[in-house]
A protein has these predicted regions:
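Post-Walker A helix-loop "phosphate-sensing" segment adjacent to the P-loop in P-loop NTPases
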Residues: 30-45, 56-58
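Conserved ATPase-coupling elements of RecA-like P-loop NTPase cores
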Residues: 60-66, 80, 92-104, 129-132
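Conserved AAA+ ATPase "sensor/coupling" helix adjacent to the nucleotide-binding pocket
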Residues: 156-166
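Loop/turn-to-beta-strand initiation segments
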Residues: 9, 46-48, 78-85, 113-120, ...
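Conserved AAA+ ATPase "SRH/arginine-finger" region at the nucleotide-binding site
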Residues: 114, 142-155
Length: 166
């Protein structure tokens, strides 16, 4: 189950841990590649590249190297013209602390300009904390709230996923 509000090209899917944010993005990616009839023509056949924020942070030796890595990824995504970039666990890019870094100054101008489509996945509580500290972030992102599925929905989702694997 999800709720949405729209304002621009990029969005944040937020929900509890394990609610299915990444699964929703994966299902959307399949719809894009398959040319599903409900997908707007401007999005057809685009590719979604899923990058885990914690993996990117651990791959960089320090903040400067992380900024360079993220800048390179953003530039490559923009130049390819058919990429939607998904930053999984993106809350790690918007806060300071152990295992995280604040890349607001790097990401906000790109989100505001709207030249690159970006999907962020975040834990709901952390998103609310970040958006209170950084109201600009909340205004430039469409919000899609992913609610935990019921036991019946979970069984249906698992059945559908297993059929796809056969």
């Amino acid at each position: 189950t999800y709720h949405q509000s729209f304002s621009g090209w990029s969005c944040v899917t937020r929900g509890l841990n394990g609610a299915g944010k990444s699964t929703v993005v994966a299902a959307f990616a399949e719809m894009l590649i398959d040319g599903h009839k409900t997908v707007p023509s401007s999005l057809l056949y685009r590719q979604i590249f899923l990058l885990d924020a914690s993996s990117l942070i651990s791959a960089a030796a320090g903040r400067g190297e992380l900024e360079a890595l993220v800048t390179e990824i953003l530039n490559e995504s923009f130049l390819s013209k058919n990429v939607i970039l998904c930053l999984d666990n993106a809350q790690l890019f918007f806060e300071e602390g152990v295992g995280s870094v604040d890349l607001s100054n790097l990401l906000l101008p790109i989100l505001e300009a709207g030249r690159l489509r970006i999907i962020l996945t975040m834990d709901s509580q952390r998103y609310l904390q970040i958006s209170q500290r950084n109201a600009q972030l909340a205004t430039v992102l469409n919000t899609i709230v992913i609610e935990p599925s019921s036991p019946e929905e979970t069984v249906r989702i698992m059945r559908d996923q297993l059929l796809g694997l056969e």
